[in-house]
Amino acid sequence: MSLDRRGFLKLAGFIGLVAGTACARRLAGPGSRYTTADGALEAKRWAMVIDMRRFTTAGDTQRVIDACHKAHNVPRIDDVRHEVKWIWTDTFDHVFPDQTHAHLPKALQERPFLLLCNQCDNPPCTRVCPTDATYRLADGIVAQDYHRCIGCRFCMAGCPYGARSFNWVNPRPYVGEVNPEFPTRSIGVVEKCNFCVDRLERGEVVRCAEVSAGGIVVGDLNDPESEV
């Protein structure tokens, strides 16, 4: 069957309309770029509570760090200049600088505390990103689109918690066993904790909470019946 120029343009326009409609459905909902599959875990406002009383040894914290990083193909780079991290530990004075004082118990001073992205209500990282590579979903999760990231690092400068990492080198050789359910990144891209939005869409629990033996709890901040 032959197709003249006018017929081709009509067909192309129809295909574009169908594709545009499909994309619009996929992106439907304020602040959402993810489809909601059957069985997905949902919340009005996702939140996390970390009970540090449950983390009594270095192994307790390392377990959740390893589980998170393995699930999301976070590279393990020994050079601290190129380190990439989604969840990590630091001392009390670095985690809670406003609550540090001269009479703080020594045990508290020396104890490691877990850190990760705070999923801010009004995230400065999303406001300074020129390509909309980082954005806030309607449920409060601050997500990241690696393909849109141009590596300007404005989001890193805007984040007051140091929760973002930049891939100074190709991260793929530093990923041990690749998880095929989550994309690997490339050099020149920023990344951070995404509150396991990919797992929630599959109906799976946030990975760090899953392996924390009750030390990390996630739930809906707007639901009075939620664990948080």
Which residues does each predicted region cover?
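Residue-level detector of secondary-structure transition/capping positions
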Residues: G16-L17, A22
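Exposed loop/turn and edge beta-strand positions of beta-sandwich/beta-sheet ligand-binding modules
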Residues: K44, R111, A138
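N-terminal secretory signal peptides and thylakoid transit peptides that target proteins
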Residues: M1-G16
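Non-heme iron-sulfur electron-transfer modules
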Residues: A28-A37, H72-L108, Y135-R148, A163-V189, ...
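Composition- and surface-driven signal marking solvent-exposed, interaction-prone regions
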Residues: L3-D4, V206-A209, N222-V228
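C-terminal segment of N-terminal export signals and the immediately downstream linker at the start
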Residues: G7, A22-Q62
